[in-house]
Amino acid sequence: MKWLGESKNMVVNGRRNGGKLSNDHQQNQSKLQHTGKDTLKAGKNAVERRSNRCNGNSGFEGQSRYVPSSGMSAKELCENDDLATSLVLDPYLGFQTHKMNTSAFPSRSSRHFSKSDSFSHNNPVRFRPIKGRQEELKEVIERFKKDEHLEKAFKCLTSGEWARHYFLNKNKMQEKLFKEHVFIYLRMFATDSGFEILPCNRYSSEQNGAKIVATKEWKRNDKIELLVGCIAELSEIEENMLLRHGENDFSVMYSTRKNCAQLWLGPAAFINHDCRPNCKFVSTGRDTACVKALRDIEPGEEISCYYGDGFFGENNEFCECYTCERRGTGAFKSRVGLPAPAPVINSKYGLRETDKRLNRLKKLGDSSKNSDSQSVSSNTDADTTQEKNNATSNRKSSVGVKKNSKSRTLTRQSMSRIPASSNSTSSKLTHINNSRVPKKLKKPAKPLLSKIKLRNHCKRLEQKNASRKLEMGNLVLKEPKVVLYKNLPIKKDKEPEGPAQAAVASGCLTRHAAREHRQNPVRGAHSQGESSPCTYITRRSVRTRTNLKEASDIKLEPNTLNGYKSSVTEPCPDSGEQLQPAPVLQEEELAHETAQKGEAKCHKSDTGMSKKKSRQGKLVKQFAKIEESTPVHDSPGKDDAVPDLMGPHSDQGEHSGTVGVPVSYTDCAPSPVGCSVVTSDSFKTKDSFRTAKSKKKRRITRYDAQLILENNSGIPKLTLRRRHDSSSKTNDQENDGMNSSKISIKLSKDHDNDNNLYVAKLNNGFNSGSGSSSTKLKIQLKRDEENRGSYTEGLHENGVCCSDPLSLLESRMEVDDYSQYEEESTDDSSSSEGDEEEDDYDDDFEDDFIPLPPAKRLRLIVGKDSIDIDISSRRREDQSLRLNA
């Protein structure tokens, strides 16, 4: 398997099936060439006769179509190539490479042959002028690789006694042609050649083969100019006299353009065939050619060309190339009747064979036979990445990685929820590069062992506090499974022992904060007791992913705060903290705020968690009615946000009183002013809020969100309505209860049975009044079969009858109208559609997220427009988003 043999329309003679188009085809072609071209042939023959006289050649060479521009006939090319390879390549490789051995057939006038070269047909002569000088010749080649002196190397190669006898019968022109041919082979070893010749024993058709391997990176359309092919055209008589089928016809190609056979020799004759070649031959002159790269070639990659469709049998059925081995075709095809079935994802569609995929296959060590149909994208398991992040977080308090703020994928990154035992910022860190990979091809994330232990511990705590209830507006829900919206009155049967018992269970990094906050990232988050810290993510944290370190040794005194020298922060999903947007007034008296300001302290952990100073924000006057006197702390002068946390999953027994606190988290508006932290058990806010002073006043658009998961039509329904206070539509059902910058819903129980999990994360873009920006709505729902009675009871008290306790949740949503987003925005429907579509790829950031259960479509209603979203497929190419006006 060395070079071009017989093909249906390319070559004359083949190594294996040369019977079809051998002699008859040659005769027919020669007849076509001679008929109707007598005048041209006469002129050409005259030129040939003149050149033959000059060169001292006669015999059948005079019958050649014409002498090439180099003056080297086909027979001379064969002789020179055999001698050049014997001098240059054979000593270097350590074995004898392919030879034409045409000297066994002397011409009628054999004046230029030595006597030892004239043997019978049955005893072909091989060039062995360098017998006993292999080591010496190899040293010449090694020396040339260092100094690259062509003339010096040629003299050393032709310094033997054999050379005097060989050149005795050669004229000056023939000596020059031979010298140039040796130079062509010597240039293979130049440092700037970009390739090298190596032994190759892969193919069964040859014992001692060779291959050409790239030594540098070649780009597409680059010409490998030193990989030269020398061409000589063959007449019918020359073919019969010089070529022996299956022995030396490895480099004969038929030119359909010239309608003649061509002999190709030189360094390019060692290029092997591949059914997926990376190079092709291009002409560089009348009798020379070089190689052009069809695609990028890496160093160490073999350079290959395509020999033809029928070179290795019918349809190359005996081909032994790497591509046939990988595909299971050619000589590697299953010979047992039917072809071996290959695993196919979709019979109509398959991934193309690209170099990146094939190289990734080699690196990953995947099964090579599946590369034609299966994705070889590197899907890193969540646990692997998370464990690495945990190890990193034990050494560093925060690690910032600069991200491209204008990248649509990065701005839409959904920060994963931090489990209680982990401080990693993201369990899917590699998902940034794999956002286009379908979820069906991704490995499901497995929860860590420490996380399972925490869940079991939390479950035991919940059983002890099963009697605790939470009132959210008119909804009465049992167990901390429903998101609390900011400023909701919280009533519990038992008061916790103070804000000092606030502990962080896990961190939640919502997507809206990725684009809403451009402040400094949080360097430290502190918690009390053995619980893990809550990770707070600001707008800038999208580009600087923060790894937070455990601060289990930190103890908080009562009435003290965790100080954060950062901007407006993101609270945690499983903690009872409540953060209020900065443009909205906080629920504190200014005097009380000032009094408590002195008690605000920033704690540093033993491992050196650093706090980052933010710019000095303006003092925010905050007025609110406090129904019960509770310790609420804020330091608006220095700290942009001072959250005090109430963790429902505290690991200490004394903190078990906070288990009943429902899961809640809201987002803060991107104002560099302070956010108060509500740690009270029962807290009622004013219905009317005054806008606080900030750098830039922004008009706030408020929405009511209604989510119906299961109804008669079977399509989950999400309805958004503008509030009356945004000078738009009215919906007075929930004027008195809730006020938040956006809606974040997460319903979760325990994760012991993953089959019962229901997850829905939605990113919806809205255009606020000026149409200059968009924001996101994030909804996370997890189905749980337990405690359906309490959920249903709360929903019935709200006056709504639902078959499923998760079927209806109403809340309010605020959209801050400002133009700091890096992302383009369109009208409501198109923006919502884009966000929903992209959410199909971002919704598996959480460790315990699983693909959506049977629900096939989700209907999003914004005003008079609605969108039906197909949530059963993870493919971006699925054109399943339909806009219904």
Curated annotation (Swiss-Prot):
Residues 816-827, 833-849 have a biased composition (Acidic residues). Residues 367-378, 393-402 have a biased composition (Low complexity). Residues 24-33, 53-62, 379-392, 410-436 have a biased composition (Polar residues). GO terms for cellular component: centrosome; ciliary basal body; cilium; condensed chromosome, centromeric region; cytoplasmic ribonucleoprotein granule; fibrillar center; intercellular bridge; microtubule cytoskeleton. It comes from the Eukaryota. The keyword Transferase applies. InterPro entries: Hist-Lys_N-MTase_N (IPR041938), KMT5B_SET (IPR044424), SET_dom (IPR001214), SET_dom_sf (IPR046341), Suv4-20/Set9 (IPR039977), Suv4-20_animal (IPR025790). One of its GO terms (biological process) is positive regulation of double-strand break repair via nonhomologous end joining. Transmembrane segments: none annotated. It catalyses: N(6)-methyl-L-lysyl(20)-[histone H4] + S-adenosyl-L-methionine = N(6),N(6)-dimethyl-L-lysyl(20)-[histone H4] + S-adenosyl-L-homocysteine + H(+); N(6),N(6)-dimethyl-L-lysyl(20)-[histone H4] + S-adenosyl-L-methionine = N(6),N(6),N(6)-trimethyl-L-lysyl(20)-[histone H4] + S-adenosyl-L-homocysteine + H(+); L-lysyl(20)-[histone H4] + S-adenosyl-L-methionine = N(6)-methyl-L-lysyl(20)-[histone H4] + S-adenosyl-L-homocysteine + H(+). Residues 1-62, 363-444, 590-655, 716-740, 816-850 are annotated as: Disordered. Zn(2+) binds at C275, C319, C321, C324. Changing G229Y: Abolishes histone methyltransferase activity (H4-K20 specific). There is a cross-link at K555 (Glycyl lysine isopeptide (Lys-Gly) (interchain with G-Cter in SUMO2)). Changing W264A: Abolishes histone methyltransferase activity (H4-K20 specific). Changing F311A: Km for H4K20me1rise to 8.5 uM. 3-fold decrease in catalytic efficiency. Optimum pH is 8. It is an enzyme of class 2 (transferase). S-adenosyl-L-methionine binds at H98, Y203, S204, S205, E206, A210, R257, N272, H273, E320. Homodimer. Interacts with HP1 proteins CBX1, CBX3 and CBX5. Interacts with RB1 family proteins RB1, RBL1 and RBL2. Interacts (via C-terminus) with FRG1. Histone methyltransferase that specifically methylates monomethylated 'Lys-20' (H4K20me1) and dimethylated 'Lys-20' (H4K20me2) of histone H4 to produce respectively dimethylated 'Lys-20' (H4K20me2) and trimethylated 'Lys-20' (H4K20me3) and thus regulates transcription and maintenance of genome integrity. In vitro also methylates unmodified 'Lys-20' (H4K20me0) of histone H4 and nucleosomes. H4 'Lys-20' trimethylation represents a specific tag for epigenetic transcriptional repression. It is linked to Intellectual developmental disorder, autosomal dominant 51: A disorder characterized by significantly below average general intellectual functioning associated with impairments in adaptive behavior and manifested during the developmental period. This is Histone-lysine N-methyltransferase KMT5B.
